[in-house]
Amino acid sequence: MPELPEVEVVRRGLAEHVTGKTITGVRVHHPRAVRRHEAGPADLTARLLDVRITGTGRRGKYLWLTLDDSAALVVHLGMSGQMLLGPIRDTRHLRIAAVLDDGTALSFVDQRTFGGWQLTEMVTVDGTDVPEPVAHIARDPLDPLFDRDRVVTVLRGKHSEIKRQLLDQTVVSGIGNIYADEALWRTKINGARIAAALPRRRLAELLDAAAEVMTDALGQGGTSFDSLYVNVNGESGYFDRSLDAYGREGEPCRRCGAIMRREKFMNRSSFYCPRCQPRPRVPRV
């Protein structure tokens, strides 16, 4: 699933090319792509016609277009969703097609059909307007209003693994499996350590590292392990070449030379250095 940097790459592309444009045509090619819009495909199509796109937004992994009727079009990318501008060659996985008033084609392509579009109202949470489905999502480390000290306080009250908390979008959003492993490696913290047992200073360093690694990834177009994670022009990012932890099982740690390990965690894989990031000791009974 795309994480914050990959979603932000898409948002920036949309902001540049669709802001100020009016939607003049919409066609839903697969009903599953609008299953979150409870009123159905016909309602979504009718409500989008002749509506102007006033801007774009993102919180964590959530992406949306703001509209001039005070609604928002939430774009769920899911595992493989793509927002593409211009003509597309392969229409096998085209789920929704829209046309803008300058003739630009805006396509939602989704091979695995976990994503989709949803029209929703905006609500105000902590002084910020967000789509209603995003109201429960915490701010992410790249949000200008992100309160690191507040999140550290929340983490100090959590008696479960720190990696589990990094992945909890109600605690801090946007950090997925890849960037959690990268931030943990940068700070030499094992993801199995209990959040409440970590000093405030270390938790602050971890959140800073998450922001830094995602900023680094954003500068390289995000992380793309296959052709599914692309920008609005269909181009893949290349931060996967710079990963220090994720996907490096059996390779030497770039810092100390120890062999990187992989372990199962929450139906995912965790990658870490056993020397730089030793597992927490299990108390003897």
Curated annotation (Swiss-Prot):
Reaction catalyzed: Hydrolysis of DNA containing ring-opened 7-methylguanine residues, releasing 2,6-diamino-4-hydroxy-5-(N-methyl)formamidopyrimidine; 2'-deoxyribonucleotide-(2'-deoxyribose 5'-phosphate)-2'-deoxyribonucleotide-DNA = a 3'-end 2'-deoxyribonucleotide-(2,3-dehydro-2,3-deoxyribose 5'-phosphate)-DNA + a 5'-end 5'-phospho-2'-deoxyribonucleoside-DNA + H(+)
Keyword set includes Iron: no
Source organism superkingdom: Bacteria
Matches recorded under InterPro entries: DNA_glyclase/AP_lyase_DNA-bd, DNA_glyclase_Znf_dom_DNA_BS, Formamido-pyr_DNA_Glyclase, FPG_cat, MutM-like_N-ter, Ribosomal_uS13-like_H2TH, Znf_DNA_glyclase/AP_lyase, Znf_FPG/IleRS
UniProt KW keywords: DNA damage, DNA repair, DNA-binding, Glycosidase, Hydrolase, Lyase, Metal-binding, Multifunctional enzyme, Zinc, Zinc-finger
First and last residues of each zinc finger (FPG-type): 244-278
Consequence of gene loss (knockout): Loss of excision of 8-oxoG from dsDNA. No significant growth in the presence of 3 mM H(2)O(2). 4-fold increase in mutation frequency upon plating on rifampicin (mutator phenotype); an increase in A to G and C to G mutations is seen.
Amino acids binding DNA: H93, R112, K158
GO biological process: base-excision repair
Gene3D superfamilies to which the protein is assigned, alphabetical: 1.10.8.50, MutM-like, N-terminal
Active site positions: P2 (schiff-base intermediate with dna), E3 (proton donor), K61 (proton donor), R268 (proton donor)
A GO term, aspect molecular function: zinc ion binding
UniProt EC number: 3.2.2.23, 4.2.99.18
Cofactor: Zn(2+)
Co-factor binding details: Binds 1 zinc ion per subunit.
Subunit structure: Monomer.
Role noted for this protein: Involved in base excision repair of DNA damaged by oxidation or by mutagenic agents. Acts as a DNA glycosylase that recognizes and removes damaged bases. Acts on oxidized purines, such as 7,8-dihydro-8-oxoguanine (8-oxoG) when paired with C, G or T. Has AP (apurinic/apyrimidinic) lyase activity and introduces nicks in the DNA strand. Cleaves the DNA backbone by beta-delta elimination to generate a single-strand break at the site of the removed base with both 3'- and 5'-phosphates.
NCBIfam families: fpg, PRK01103.1
Family indicated by similarity: Belongs to the FPG family.
Name of the molecule in the record: Formamidopyrimidine-DNA glycosylase
Taxonomic lineage from the root: Bacteria, Bacillati, Actinomycetota, Actinomycetes, Mycobacteriales
Gene: fpg
